[in-house]
Amino acid sequence: MGVPMDHDAGAAGQVGQLDWLLDDLVHRVGHVTKAVILSQDGMALGASQTLSRDDAEHLAALAAGFQSLARGAERHFGNGGAVRQTIIEMESGFLLTSAAGSGTCLAVIAEPAADLGLVAYEMAILVRRTGEHIRVNTRASALSGWG
């Protein structure tokens, strides 16, 4: 069982109250084991109960790094648009990240047997339902392409 997160006081809305939605995602979607909402600078804003505080913070930092790399690739090789999603395939499963509200991201860990289409769809639904409630105002958010 995870440890309750101290949520960023600068987050618009009540991010901590979204933890139950992350728990619901983990319990409803087959082979999804962990979920975290994070700020673009890698701060965990909310996490499923399947993550300890340390693991939530570690996953948030990793996911922020991957999103940053993806944005750099889009700026250099693409047309400078927003990064919608990144998927990292590991031997032990997948790490999926998706832009959420302004300055935030949703990251999910899934087992190898996960239906990635379903996981991505459920992530998109969750982002649509919560995106406007999980905005984080950061000094770089306007320049970064998040949200």
Task: State what each model feature region is.
Residues 2-32, 41-147:
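Acidic, low-complexity cytosolic segments
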